């Protein structure tokens, strides 16, 4: 436990909160940064979009961004699918997240310009930019930002409110 910083604890039994507590200075009303939890929300948005027949997990990534492709599209980039992004097996080695997320350029264009050295779908490599690309794809096919798209489909039905979503 020494390596973890706990802010709260909640015990749920039979679907009801039976106990909860917070360590100062944290409290129920304080918003917490969720970091990689957003990956779960993004993949849920992809699932809704698939259900609504707006996209398929077998769609190629490049099909969504014809105006942002590099001059030369490698065979591996051409075969990268939504499923490869979901499973973090896009084939980019090393993970381009740090380089792209600190740039001031077009992140989609930079992701697509990153060399795909491994066949997509064959090797897992943690890649937060893959989640960013999923978000960009959902925004492209729905015309809405992820939080706006999820609001009526997920957040409101579950009573999730008061959230901030970094764009």
Per-range role (PLM):
Residues 1-26:
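A short, well-structured edge-of-sheet supersecondary motif
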Residues 33, 52-90, 113, 142-167:
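Active-site helix/loop module of the DD-peptidase/beta-lactamase fold
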Residues 35-41, 77-80, 125-132:
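Aromatic- and histidine-enriched alpha-helix N-cap/loop-to-helix transition segments
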Residues 15, 32-58, 85, 134-138:
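Active-site SXXK
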Residues 2-4, 25-26, 56, 76-80, ...:
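Extracellular/periplasmic catalytic domains that process cell-envelope and extracellular macromolecules
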Residues 28-29, 92-167:
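Catalytic-site signature segments of enzymes, centered on catalytic residues
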Residues 16, 90-91:
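Solvent-exposed coil/turn segments that connect beta secondary-structure elements
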Residues 6-8, 57-58, 97-98, 165:
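Surface-exposed patches in mature extracellular/periplasmic domains of secreted proteins
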């Amino acid at each position: 436990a020494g390596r973890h910083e706990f802010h709260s604890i909640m015990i749920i039994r039979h679907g009801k909160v039976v106990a909860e507590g917070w360590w100062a200075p944290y409290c129920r009303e304080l918003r917490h940064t969720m970091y990689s939890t957003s990956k779960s929300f993004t993949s849920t948005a992809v699932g809704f979009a698939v259900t609504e027949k707006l996209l398929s997990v077998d769609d190629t990534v490049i099909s969504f961004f014809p105006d942002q492709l590099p001059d030369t599209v490698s065979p591996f980039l051409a075969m990268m699918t939504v499923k490869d992004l979901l499973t973090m097996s896009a084939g980019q080695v090393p993970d381009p997240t740090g380089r792209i997320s600190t740039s001031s350029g077009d992140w989609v264009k930079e992701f697509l310009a990153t060399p795909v050295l491994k066949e997509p779908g064959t090797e897992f490599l943690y890649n937060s930019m893959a989640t960013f690309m999923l978000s960009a794809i959902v925004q492209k096919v729905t015309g809405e930002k992820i939080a706006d798209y999820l609001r009526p489909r997920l957040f409101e039905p579950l009573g999730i409110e008061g959230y901030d979503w970094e764009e």
